[in-house]
């Protein structure tokens, strides 16, 4: 787990945010309007960016990976040399390493999904994803109108800041370049249908694909979005499903919720169970050793 954090998870998320910050800084340096609009986003992206870097620095300073590996080696040797405990504890480290390796592609897909959709990606995706539960409720003929009304109210409030700070040239750069990062780093088996049009008609031309999406979607048109939110019903939900911006967002989100999140949860549960045995075994076999869980 430490090796994953230091050498894979944090560096990948840092690289993603590097891309976001580079785009924002370049546009902010030449346009005071962009500087005003995106100062909060830049600060938000920078905060976790620094935290990810700090975690790597701190763990490396502690030589945490080597210490953890040394403890695991001692544990396995002690287990294998103790006949009452060899069967229960002897292969725990091997099993844990195998699970972490298998879980890796799902963990990284989750990380890229969160970065692209919520934390440091294009604002249009972050805005559009708020419509997903509303469309789901209305499409299923749900009678839970209270929840729909609450979600619509939240989006109306959010839309004010969203459109106030939206600068399309910057937004389109974020979408094109970060979509490419997502595509190239998330395992293709977990892409879902999000990239069919990009791979087919647009032949992996991210700029042309982006121009198409932003020229057709209602999510960058304040008047259209206001009208949608003021008239949210089943017919509106059906129409939103045909919006190209919604389709990109929804296909990425559907791939995550159907293919990534369940598998990651399964691996997390298996790892938790084995980790309990590992901690139990440490107390029995190496009671005086400093622990690195």
Regions found by a protein language model. Name each.
Residues 1-292:
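Terminal presequence/propeptide segments associated with secretion/organelle targeting
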């Amino acid at each position: 787990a430490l090796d994953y954090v230091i050498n894979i998870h944090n560096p990948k998320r840092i690289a993603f945010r590097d891309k976001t910050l580079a785009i924002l800084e370049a546009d902010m340096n030449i346009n005071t309007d962009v500087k005003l609009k995106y100062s909060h986003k830049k600060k938000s992206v920078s905060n976790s960016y620094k935290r990810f870097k700090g975690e790597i620095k701190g763990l490396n300073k502690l030589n945490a990976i080597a210490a953890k590996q040394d403890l695991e080696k001692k544990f396995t040797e002690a287990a294998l040399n103790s006949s009452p405990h060899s069967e229960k504890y002897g292969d725990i480290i091997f099993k844990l390493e195998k699970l972490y390796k298998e879980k890796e592609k799902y963990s990284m897909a989750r990380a890229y999904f969160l970065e692209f959709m919520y934390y440091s990606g294009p604002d249009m995706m972050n805005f559009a994803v708020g419509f997903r539960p509303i469309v789901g409720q209305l499409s299923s003929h749900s009678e839970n109108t209270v929840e729909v009304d609450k979600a619509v109210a939240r989006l109306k409030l959010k839309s004010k800041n969203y459109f106030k700070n939206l600068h399309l040239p910057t937004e389109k750069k974020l979408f094109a370049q970060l979509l490419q990062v997502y595509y190239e780093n998330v395992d293709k088996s977990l892409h879902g249908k999000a990239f069919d049009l990009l791979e087919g008609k647009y032949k992996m031309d991210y700029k042309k694909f982006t121009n198409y999406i932003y020229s057709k979607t209602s999510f960058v048109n304040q008047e259209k979005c206001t009208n949608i939110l003021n008239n949210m019903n089943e017919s509106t939900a059906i129409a939103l499903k045909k919006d190209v911006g919604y389709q990109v967002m929804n296909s990425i989100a559907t791939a995550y919720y159907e293919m990534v999140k369940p598998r990651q949860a399964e691996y997390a549960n298996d790892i938790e169970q084995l980790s309990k045995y590992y901690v139990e075994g440490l107390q029995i076999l190496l009671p005086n050793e400093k622990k690195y869980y």
